[in-house]
Each structure stands twice: as structure tokens, then as C-alpha cells.
Regions:
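Catalytic-site signature of metal-activated, phosphate-bearing donor transferases
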Residues: 1-119
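Residues that mark the junctions of alpha-helical repeat units in TPR/alpha-solenoid scaffolds
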Residues: 79, 97, 136, 170, ...
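Tetratricopeptide repeat
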Residues: 81-84, 88-91, 118, 125, ...
């Protein structure tokens, strides 16, 4: 791997981007995206108590490191009990960090804390810095799923449509909405929306894509 990094590290490069396989489907890659945590020895600092990211102290120049893949194999025996408190700490330290607001709202949804999920994800959408359409659509999908879990299907439908309109180039909004309609016996609607999902043929290399 060192040779691949050195080949990409031309003059002026301070940060490297590489293929990161976050999950696996048997021997195949599941969720994958470009990660960027290879950086120069100086000029960067790490922030956040969880979902750590690196931020440059000044100008930076990144390069794609071709042929380098990092595989993520989480330890299933390791407790995740501290994860939610650390996310809450991250948001309390920097309430205007849109990424952490999304992560916290998503975690509330995963924990079945649906009212808190709706509140925090709505706050994420209202932040001026929350401009990444894929992530905004993901927040809308989790809001929709929370409303559905609370038995409010009309509100869930509204948010699924909003998610699709926010990021029509992502499969996930249309797929999730189709799955809900199928479960409710609305087969015509499910077919319509699953075809919307199938019409998206290019997968984005972001962590949102599943």
C-alpha cells in the first residue's frame, strides 16, 4: 500500500482519498465510498468525540489513491453503549455541526426514540450548513420512517416524497417509499416507486448509498 500512496502523493498533495468498504455482502462489497483520512504529518487536526474527522489548518490539496482499498470489519463483540452519549456530547459541543446532527438523529431512530429522531433530524435540515442533498434526503427518510413507526402513515408518505425530490439521483428514497407502500398493500404505488428506484443506474460513492 505504501507504493500506491507514494505514487499518488505528488508535490503539494496533503490529503489522500481512497476506496473504503464499510460493509460486506458475503465476499462482495456492500456499502462503499471514498474516505479521506490519509493526511500529511502536519497541518491537520482531528475533531469530534465520535465519527472523528480531520480538518486542515489552512489550504489543502487532495489526490485519489488508485488501487488502495481499506476494508472495515467491525468487532461484533464490542459494546456500542457509549455511542449515543458520545454523539450527544458532540452535538452539545458544536450544535451547528450538521453532520453530527444527522448522525444523532439517525441514532435516535435506530434506538426507537422516534420523537427525538424527528426533532433532531428536523433541526439538521434547518441548519444553514446542511446543504448536501444526499444527506438531507437521508434525514428526511429517517423522519418518514419514524412517523411510520409511530403509526402516522400520511406524514411518512409526505416525507418520503420530500426525500425523493431532494435527491432524485439516489435510489434510497424511492426504494424505501416503495417498500412502505408494498407493506401497506398499495401494490400499484409500490411498482411506480420501485421503478423510480430502478431508473437510477449510477451509484454514488458516498456513505449514504446502501
Amino acid at each position: 500500500w505504501r507504493e500506491k500512496i507514494e505514487k499518488a502523493w505528488k508535490a503539494g498533495v496533503t490529503r489522500g482519498r481512497y476506496r473504503y468498504v464499510w460493509s460486506h455482502d458475503g465476499e462482495r462489497a456492500g456499502v462503499e465510498f471514498l474516505a479521506d483520512k490519509i493526511h500529511a504529518r502536519r497541518g491537520y487536526r482531528w475533531i469530534n468525540p465520535v465519527h472523528e474527522v480531520i480538518v486542515p489548518d489552512g489550504a489543502e490539496k487532495s489526490a485519489i489513491i488508485g488501487g488502495l482499498t481499506l476494508h472495515h470489519y467491525p468487532d461484533p463483540s464490542k459494546s456500542r453503549a457509549a455511542y449515543l452519549p458520545l454523539l450527544e456530547l458532540a452535538v452539545s459541543e458544536d450544535p451547528n455541526n450538521d453532520r453530527n446532527a444527522h448522525y444523532l438523529g439517525r441514532e435516535y431512530y435506530f434506538r426507537g426514540m422516534y420523537d427525538k429522531a424527528i426533532k433532531e433530524l428536523s433541526r439538521h435540515l434547518a441548519l444553514p450548513s446542511a446543504v448536501w442533498r444526499e444527506e438531507r434526503a437521508a434525514s428526511m427518510r429517517y423522519i418518514a420512517a419514524s412517523y411510520r413507526a409511530l403509526g402516522n402513515s400520511p406524514e411518512a408518505e409526505k416525507w418520503y416524497v420530500r426525500a425523493y425530490l431532494e435527491s432524485p439521483d439516489s435510489r434510497e428514497p424511492a426504494f424505501d417509499y416503495a417498500r412502505m407502500l408494498y407493506a401497506e398493500g398499495n401494490y400499484a404505488g409500490a411498482v411506480f416507486w420501485i421503478n423510480k428506484a430502478l431508473a437510477v443506474t449510477v451509484r454514488t460513492l458516498s456513505y449514504i448509498s446502501s
